[in-house]
From Swiss-Prot:
Belongs to the lst-2 family. This is Lateral signaling target protein 2 homolog. It holds the Pfam family FYVE. Zn(2+) 2 binds at residues 903, 906, 933, 936. Negative regulator of epidermal growth factor receptor (EGFR) signaling. Acts by promoting EGFR degradation in endosomes when not monoubiquitinated. Residues 679-709 have a biased composition (Basic and acidic residues).
Length: 951
């Protein structure tokens, strides 16, 4: 009864602007809607139910907004911390978020659960109950105070508001975190790095003329697309150590670019092959919002991205089919399937690792999907090139791991390319003998490096045609001429190249002081696998003969022994004859392998030429003759089997199964030093070589004297005792197939210091690596018809990634661009405040000189005082419609669509665009927002502008 009397006596007026009065009526409206909603059967009238629910939530928003204003007024300095709100996505940070939270809290308190969030719902239910209970208490206290005194906030009400504010902030964080992903501090730090990258990109674009400052100041809409595109290029090339550093783990990258990690790696590899002019052209094209048309039939010659310093060291590779007339091949890289290109790029996942770890790891034997085995028996390089281009048309383009990094993929080649050359086409008699007789038959070197059990045989030369076989025989007989048949195919780093590139390997080998095999491995780290046509021959060659007691169970051990023995031979050559002890230890370990038969690789002609070449070195203290003598029994037996099986070509080197009685017996127990002079060793080597060539095809056994001599020679101690513990001398039999020649070559650099005149400098090793890198880049560029084709591919891929950011990460991208514009927009000079004030006053007077309200001397504070006292002015007279045919502000003519609107503040006529604001006009008694023009809204309605301008 007392409450009714007080309500009747002290009930506030609806027009009262005080917060407690406004809350009273807002809460009354909420209670009415809630009561009607409770009494309504939603199944009978669903439309009415939906309407009431929306009205109920709107009333909740209104009540919470007024409570928030009351808290800002009475406990302004005691509010709960809400810094976590910056973590929320922009799309949920709106005015009615509080009402949604209240509605969610009531649902959870009533026992409901959030869909697919059962655990979070159970955890938040106690907090939701506390929040609804506290909110009900706050509402009762504020209603009671509104019926007592509208100007006083009691301590009890303040304490209740503090408790409610803390609970509401805690529930807001929990509820929003359960509904939407909230960034962690680490993710915010990464996003700040992305913002810095975008700012650096815009600053660079301004310097290079891609963008203008006016575009930034005017918030040009096209920049929403241009800036992310340019940022991808800068993040991959210019600022490679920034947030787009692909050497990081994907989980450490920004979530914007994390899904595109693989595609960005491919884009980076292509960007690194561009010249400065090409990069400039690409960035220019990326600044254009629409698609750019690239000429399809441009100059087929792709400009080289090689620095001028290395152009002479590595000649530019000419496209093998530059003059092809096949129009289908010309359209292989057609630009009509850009979307398909992007999808295929996303599917190409190839791991890319460290550069040196690739060079020091054994090559893989698996075929690359970019080089499938051809099924054609045609030996023409033109046909082979056409097939390769046809494959490229299917897969658009496939980027190899740049710099030889990552997982090294094996290559599958046709049978006609089973001979490859790595020697100089123009032999110079003054050059060391290292340059002689370096033929690699059937990928001799590469296949020795990595051989998988049961996948291929190293010694298959049955498919070599006559011209190639004659050339191979000439090479084995110390011929210095290169294979000039048109069917010959050269391999550099596993790719099709010309003879000049092979010459480069020789040059680098010569500069590095006898590391020709190492240089060759660097250029050719990928194994050459045989084509399907040669598989039957391989299978037949692997079957032991009737006189050979080898069984199928012993073939694995035989292959391991072959690999290890050949690696030891190559090791002795690469290390300039200073690793004899290492090779002795390796062969001693090989004797203990439990196998009744061995397979020894007969790459004797290659190793022999290398070792004889070392005899010409003036300062080497260790002769290579001992290496020849130690290896001679094995090699001679292998050559005997070679001459017996291939009568037409007696000089062909092969890797064949040996009889079980032919064991490798190397006795290294003697410690007598080597006393023979260099001339004697050279003459003995020549006799040994002559004897090998003239040996008949019948069974040959080693004389005891030769074996004794070999035992004495191999027992000599080397000055490099540290190499006894090298990788090749300590590996087990199960690890033989993973031994890498490159490991031996690089780990033996220290041993080369024994040759004082040919010390290998670190710069020359870097030169070899850089040359290999350049060859790799040239191979990537050779897959594109022209420079424009390459630029177009990059344009498509980069634009695709940047445009997907607009769709998948719109909120984050808007936040980044918003910060970007705030940072990069032109700042007003604040150094001279007097000049700025005068400029503002001049601008104000110039802008308002034709307005009657601007001529008044009364200030906004005086107008506010009059409004509080109830002294209202008469509204201005409206301009008649018939006397005005143009908008007062923009001078646009009025039409049926463009209607006339009067400003309630000045009475003039404007179009809808120039009078789109609403504001209360208390000086005229208008407490509700009414239509005003832009001029009045800026200069007369908004008090802070009027006061500041009048200072």
């Amino acid at each position: 009864m007392m409450n009714r009397f007080r309500k009747w006596l002290y009930k506030p007026k609806r027009s009262d602007p005080q917060l407690l009065a406004q809350f009273y009526y807002a809460d009354e409206e909420l209670n009415q809607v809630a009561a009607e909603l409770d009494s309504l059967d939603g199944r009978k009238d669903p439309q009415r139910c939906t309407l009431l629910v929306n009205q109920f939530r709107s009333c909740q928003d209104n009540v919470l907004n007024i409570i928030n204003q009351i808290m800002e007024e009475c406990i302004a300095h005691e509010r709960a911390n809400r810094d976590f709100c910056v973590k929320f996505p922009e799309e949920i940070r709106h005015d009615n978020l509080a009402g949604q939270l209240w509605f969610g809290a009531e649902c959870l308190a009533a026992g409901s659960i959030i869909m697919n969030r059962e655990i979070e719902s159970m955890a938040m239910r106690p907090l939701a109950k506390d929040l609804t209970r506290s909110l009900e208490e706050v509402r009762n206290l504020i209603r009671d105070q509104a019926l007592r005194d509208l100007n006083i906030y009691t301590e009890k009400m303040k304490e209740s508001l503090r408790h409610f504010d803390v609970l509401f902030a805690e529930f807001e964080l929990s509820y929003v975190s359960a509904m939407v992903p909230v960034k962690s501090p680490k993710e915010y730090y990464v996003q700040q790095e992305v913002i810095v990258l975008f700012c650096e990109t815009v600053e660079r674009a301004l310097k290079l003329g891609y963008l203008t400052q006016d575009m930034i100041d005017d918030y040009e809409p096209a920049l929403m697309f241009t800036i992310p595109r340019l940022a991808i290029v800068c993040g991959l090339v210019v600022y490679a150590e920034g947030p787009l550093n692909l050497e990081r783990k994907p989980e450490d990258m920004s979530e914007l670019f994390r899904p595109f990690h693989t595609l960005l790696r491919k884009i980076r590899d292509l960007l690194q092959t561009l010249t400065e002019d090409e990069l400039h052209t690409l960035e220019r094209n990326l600044c254009i919002s629409q698609d750019v048309e690239f000429p399809a039939n441009a100059d087929p010659e792709v400009p080289s991205a090689i620095s001028p310093v290395l152009v002479t060291a590595l000649p530019t590779e000419e496209p093998p089919m530059a003059k092809a007339e096949n129009t289908e091949v010309e359209l292989a890289c057609s630009m009509q399937y850009d979307e398909q290109e992007l999808e295929q790029l996303n599917m190409m996942v190839h791991r890319v690792g460290d550069e040196m770890s690739s060079l020091l790891s054994p090559p893989s034997v698996y075929q690359s999907p970019a080089h499938r085995a051809n099924t054609s028996n045609e030996a023409s390089p033109c046909r082979r090139a056409l097939d390769n281009l046809t494959d490229e048309e299917d897969r658009v383009f496939f980027m190899e791991d740049l710099d030889g990094s990552g997982e090294v993929l094996a290559r599958s080649r046709p049978s006609e390319t089973t001979i490859s050359w790595v020697n100089n086409s123009c032999y110079n008699a003054k050059q060391p003998a290292l340059y002689q007789d370096s033929v690699l038959q059937n990928g001799d070197l590469a296949d020795v490096v990595s051989v998988k059990d049961g996948q291929r045989d190293i010694s298959n030369n049955n498919n070599i045609d006559g011209s190639k076989m004659l050339a191979a025989s000439a090479s084995l007989q110390n011929s210095c001429s290169c294979l000039e048949a048109p069917e010959s195919q050269l391999y550099l780093n596993g790719w099709d190249t010309n003879g000049e590139d092979a010459e480069t390997a020789e040059i680098i080998a010569h500069r590095t002081g006898g590391m020709k095999i190492s240089a060759t491995v660097i250029f050719n780290p990928k194994s050459l696998t045989n084509s399907p046509e040669t598989s039957p021959n391989l299978a037949s060659n692997r079957i032991p003969s009737s006189s050979d007691p080898l069984t199928s169970n012993e073939e694995d051990e035989s292959h391991k022994l072959s690999i290890a023995a050949t690696n030891c031979l190559i090791n002795s050559c690469v290390c300039c004859g200073s690793c004899e002890d290492t090779r002795e230890d390796s062969l001693e370990g090989l004797r203990n392998v439990p196998s009744s038969g061995k397979v020894i690789n007969a790459s004797y002609s290659l190793i022999k030429s290398k070792e004889l070449g070392h005899l010409d070195r003036s300062d080497c203290t260790v002769s290579a003759k001992e290496l020849l003598k130690m290896d001679s029994p094995t090699v001679l037996l292998a050559e005997k089997e070679t001459t017996r099986q291939e009568q037409p070509y007696p000089n062909s080197s092969k890797c064949l199964p040996l009889n079980s009685g032919s064991q490798v017996e190397m006795d290294s127990e003697s410690d007598e030093p080597l006393t023979a002079s260099r001339d004697q060793l050279r003459s003995e080597s020549n006799r040994q070589e002559t004897g090998n060539k003239e040996r008949p095809s019948e069974e040959v056994e080693e004389p005891p004297s030769d074996r004794a001599s070999a035992d004495n020679i191999t027992s000599s101690s080397s000055s490099q005792d540290g190499l006894r513990d090298s990788a090749l001398s300590s590996i087990s039999s199960s690890d033989y197939e993973s031994v890498s020649v490159t490991t031996c070559s690089l780990s033996s650099i220290d041993s080369l210091s024994s040759c004082s005149s040919d010390d290998i400098d670190q710069e020359e090793i870097q030169l070899a690596l850089q040359a290999a890198k350049i060859a790799s880049r040239q191979k990537i560029r050779s897959r594109f018809h022209s420079s424009n084709d390459l630029i177009h591919r990059l344009f498509v891929c980069i634009s695709g990634v940047a445009d997907q950011l607009q769709t998948n990460y719109a909120s984050d991208l808007r936040s980044i661009l918003k910060t970007l514009f705030e940072v990069m927009a032109t700042k007003q000079e604040t150094d001279d405040k007097g000049k700025q004030k005068k400029a503002n006053q001049g601008l104000r007077s110039a802008a308002l000189e034709d307005c009657a309200l601007c001529q008044e001397t009364i200030t906004s504070s005086e107008l506010a005082a009059k409004a509080r006292d109830g002294e209202f002015e008469d509204p201005p007279d409206w301009v008649p419609d018939e006397v005005c045919s143009l908008c007062t502000a923009c001078k646009a003519p009025f039409t049926v669509i463009r209607r006339k609107h009067h400003c309630r503040s000045c009475g003039k006529i404007f179009c809808s665009r120039c009078s789109s604001h609403s504001a209360p006009l208390p000086r005229y008694g208008q407490m509700k927002p009414v239509r005003v023009c832009t001029h009045c809204y800026m200069f007369h309605v908004t008090p802070f502008y009027s006061d500041r301008a009048g200072m």
